[in-house]
Each structure stands twice: as C-alpha cells, then as structure tokens.
Regions:
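PLP-dependent aminotransferase class I/II
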Residues: 247-330, 336-337
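Short acidic/glycine-enriched loop/turn segments that link adjacent beta-strands
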Residues: 262, 341-342, 385-389
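Conserved core of the PLP fold type I
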Residues: 76-217, 228-245, 249
Length: 415
C-alpha cells in the first residue's frame, strides 16, 4: 500500500531487507490525514478555519496589564492557526545538520511527542514490542506503557570491564545481545538507543549502530536519541548515516544545547517515507506560532554561532566541575562513571565505612538534603541499572558549580 503524500520513486530505500510498509501499522498506512484549506492556500482573505477575524483579546501595549516583554509575541498572527509544515525551520535544520531537505525532517512538541508518535505508528498495542537498553531515558518505557506495547530490555555493559564506550567500557552497547534479542523475538518493531546516553553520558559508536541497521533479522526501525549530541564531537552524530539507511530515525531537540527547553521543539531526521507517515498522523498545527518564531531565530547563523560558543563554555565548565568532584574522593565521592559527552556528569556516593561500595541510602540523604535544605536540585539515579549510589549533576554556571562543590563537601562530611 503506497504512503499517502509520498512519491516513492523519488526516494529509494535501503538496506534491501527493510520495507517500511511492513513496519507501519496497516491502519496507519491506510489513514487519510486531516487536511485543511490552509495546507494549500495561506494568503489572501482567510475565512476557511473559523478563526477570530478581529484578532486576539490581550490588551494593547498602552495598557498597564501588558508585560512589555510580551510585545514581540503579541505582534505575531496569534489569531491564525500556525503553519502545518514550518518548512523554513526545517530548511535551516537541514543546512545545520547536513540532511537533504525539509522532506527528511519532522517537528514535534518536544522529542517526547516524536518518540510517542513513532511508537503509535509502528507498534501494534498488545502484540508488538520495543527494545531499550537500560540505564536509559525513562520516557521510552512510559510511552510504551501508555500505548500498551511490550518492552524488551537489553542492559548496557554494566561491569565496566569490556567493550567500547564509557569508562573501561562501562555503559557500552552490547550489540551481540541486541541482535540475539531481535532474532528471538520478531515482534520487536523499534530499538531505542540514547547517544549520548541519559543518564550515562556515553556515546554509541556509529559502527555499532550500523551493525544493527544492517542486521537482516531486524525488520524494524532503529531510533537514535541525540538530545545531547552538541556536547559531543561533531562527527559523533548518527545523522551522517541517514543517506544509507531508511531504517534509521535520529531525534534531536532545541531544549539542551540551544537552551530553549521552554518552547518544546523536538526534531526527527529520517527517510522521507517515515517523515511522511509522521506528518500524516500528527495532530494538526502541532507547533505553535510563538514556538516557530523562536525556533527560526535560534537557527539563524548568528544564533547557532552563539549556541556553539555557549556549548564550549559548558564543556570547559564540565571539566572544571569534574576536577572539583574528584577532589572530594577522600570524603566518599567516587569517580564519575559513564561517558563525558553531555551537559551533565554522574557520580556515585560511596559508603562512609571506607569499603568503596556505592551507597544508595547515603546518596538519597544527600540528594534530599541538597534539595530541601540547601536549594540545590540534582537527580538521584541510584535505582537505575548500574547506577547504584549515583547522583546526576547538570553542568551549571560557574557560580552554580562552585555552590554545588561547596554543598557536596559539607554534606559528605556530615552524612
């Protein structure tokens, strides 16, 4: 069954063992997407969408009720539904990330909408599954449960004794175990890989991703979540593989390196066939006009240059924070574990008896005291696989990092 809205002859697919029409749920393939006149006509006297022709009702700039900083937003056409496609944003993203064009890009309300939509279009409730590699981002399992699909777990390398990736191989992807799980369970439709990992901070080598993409027993799609990719080396992104693999989808966001978490803009880069399916299935007008305006500005050459400058500053701060945390080793703070390619670090709190064992109870006390008494909120990750006793610390400003180190020193002595 052809994908509505796609000219397949323009977009050949490979590898040979992949057929997207066998991955997408039949009811989604047959879906006739919601369409409106605005899809075809966006100028002139617009009387097609039952909008308020008199405009919004927020008081004018002369009113004391108006916050001055809202004026740029209020000057937008807020009484009109936003663009269904946002091609100018996609074009800037295509140029930034080196993909073919807007036809290879989907925009969602944060990456979470993208992840949820991928599950909904590919995985049949009650009968089919996704595969995840703990410890990893928690929303994969949440989306799976919401959509009533199964979850197969293949933990990352937890011993730290072998494999590529983080410290001494810790949190490496166990490719052979992933392939084994695929071969044993053909109901697995999607594989979610987080690179750099959350909470691990570890990159998955492109060679490992390629090995799974080329594994003929797997007929589904590999999703590489790259929320933190700008904090890693430029050549680390799996976007470079898209031209060769129609069974790959790479997700990114403006929340991390771009510093725009509040606008909720997530991105999927994939073969045009999958992008068209997502476009056919998404809610109409999912990206708001204010979000689109801010995203367009954030992707300008000057803004991208500033983003890269701030990323460089954060990377330097990450190194400084790590040195400060290492100095706390005599107080019972273990060396950072995992990789060093995100805007956070993860450190284990060790038992006070000097045994060197990670201590979840002590870590929990420090976490809670930091938040409730010291005004410093970090993330307790001690219940994740391979993360016993661990606290995840986002890289803050220089002043914030100094406070974190001081408070950690005080609490490690006291607790």
């Amino acid at each position: 069954m052809p994908i509505l809205g796609l000219a397949p002859e323009l977009y050949p697919t490979k590898p040979a063992h992949f057929d997207i029409e066998k991955v997408i749920r039949p009811n989604i393939l047959a879906l006739h997407p919601y369409r409106c006149a605005r899809d075809d006509y966006s100028e002139g006297i617009l009387l097609d969408a039952n909008e308020n022709a008199l405009g919004h009702s927020i008081p004018s700039a002369s009113s004391s009720a108006l916050e001055p900083e809202l004026q740029p937003t209020l000057s937008l056409d807020l009484h009109r539904y936003p663009s269904p496609t946002h091609d100018p944003i996609k074009q800037r993203l295509a140029e930034l990330r080196g993909v073919s064009g807007p036809e290879s890009i989907f925009l969602g309300v944060g990456s979470d909408e993208v992840l949820d939509l991928l599950i909904r279009v590919c995985v049949a409730p009650g009968t089919e599954k996704i595969l995840i590699t703990p410890p990893t981002y928690g929303m994969y399992s949440v989306c799976a449960q919401v959509n009533d699909v199964g979850v197969v777990k293949v933990p990352l390398e937890l011993s730290g004794d072998a494999g590529e990736g983080g410290e001494r191989g810790r949190f490496s992807l166990r490719v052979d175990e992933v392939k084994k799980a695929i071969s044993e369970d053909p109901s697995i439709k999607l594989i979610f890989l987080c690179s750099p990992g959350n909470p691990t901070g570890t990159l998955i080598p492109l060679s490992s991703i390629r090995e799974i993409l080329e594994y003929e027993d797997f007929k589904g799609i590999v999703i590489v979540d790259e929320a933190y990719i700008d904090f890693a080396d430029e050549e680390a992104s799996a976007v470079s593989l898209l031209k060769d693999y129609a069974n790959l989808c790479v997700t990114q966001t403006l929340s991390k390196s771009f510093g725009l978490a509040a606008i909720r803009l997530g991105i999927a880069f994939a073969h045009p066939s999958l992008i068209q399916i997502l476009m056919n299935t998404k809610a109409p007008y999912n990206i708001s006009t204010p979000t689109a305006a801010l995203a367009q500005s954030a992707l300008s050459p000057d803004a991208v240059a500033l983003m890269k400058q701030k990323v460089s500053t954060l990377v330097a701060s990450r190194a400084s924070l790590l040195r400060g945390l290492e100095a706390l080793a005599p107080l019972g703070l273990g060396p950072a574990i995992g990789g060093n390619t995100a805007n956070f670090v993860m450190v284990p709190v060790l038992a006070k008896d000097g045994s060197g064992a990670p201590d979840n109870v002590r870590a929990g006390k420090i976490y809670k005291t930091l938040a409730e008494s010291e005004g410093v909120v970090v993330r307790f990750r001690g219940n994740e696989a391979g993360c016993a006793g661990c606290l995840r610390i986002t890289i803050g400003s220089e002043d914030e990092n100094k406070v974190v180190l001081q408070k950690f020193s005080e609490l490690l002595k006291a607790l």
